[in-house]
Amino acid sequence: MDKNIIIGAMTALITPFKNGKVDEQSYARLIKRQIENGIDAVVPVGTTGESATLTHEEHRTCIEIAVETCKGTKVKVLAGAGSNATHEAVGLAKFAKEHGADGILSVVPYYNKPTQQGLYEHYKAIAQSVDIPVLLYNVPGRTGCEISTDTIIKLFRDCENIYGVKEASGNIDKCVDLLAHEPRMMLISGEDAINYPILSNGGKGVISVTSNLLPDMISALTHFALDENYKEAKKINDELYNINKILFCESNPIPIKTAMYLAGLIESLEFRLPLCSPSKENFAKIEEVMKKYKIKGF
């Protein structure tokens, strides 16, 4: 299998709700907008997609919509399929594969704090259950557990279809160290604030929250960097500074969904508890920053 298979500019899709249910029409429309604006892959039902509060049926529906909408295009579907129970993660991975996803994104198990050996066995079981690419997802700030560089490299070398890692630890040194020890690894940025530093240090793509709103800019930044045109990539990165900052003023995806609502890209600003709408102060800050960007609605 070609491990260099799902890279480039990727969007961690929001999940729009309407009257308490997944707004399937809006979801498909948002994906079409990504396709039209140069994104290489969409990532349904990840952190940004509020996967933790979706039912399994809703989770599966979102994957099906993403696959169907991307059918016949060059845009790939990297489906969220993580869980802190290995048997459940395997089931989600199998569903994604059977329903046409091009690969899966699997988050480090959260809450139960497995050992590195436990993480190795968890991911090996997932990789052996499907024959599509698997991207590891390291986000210790949310999971309370970090997968080590050694474990990532061992999984990459032992499992043919584990092709890389989405790094959202904020630790650039770890990213550089990872590539120094295994340069074949596909390192993907999982934080918009450090997209440029990761890309300019050997990263092969981004999974972006900001690209829900500005897919064309994230696509341009990513591809300039991959083409080693770092001057243009840095220029776009600098232009995105204020929007990247405000989109994380509260827990993701609260700010990005608020921005999408303000831009008229979703009909209803709905979350599922325990997530809720932003404070009035932050709502105003998001609105103010939005005015500085050429986004529909402003």
Curated annotation (Swiss-Prot):
GO terms for molecular function: 4-hydroxy-tetrahydrodipicolinate synthase activity. The record marks T47, Y111 as: Part of a proton relay during catalysis. Its EC number is 4.3.3.7. Its main location: cytoplasm. Keywords: Amino-acid biosynthesis, Cytoplasm, Diaminopimelate biosynthesis, Lyase, Lysine biosynthesis, Schiff base. GO terms for cellular component: cytosol. It is an enzyme of class 4 (lyase). Pyruvate binds at T48, I207. Belongs to the DapA family. Catalyzes the condensation of (S)-aspartate-beta-semialdehyde [(S)-ASA] and pyruvate to 4-hydroxy-tetrahydrodipicolinate (HTPA). Homotetramer; dimer of dimers. This is 4-hydroxy-tetrahydrodipicolinate synthase.
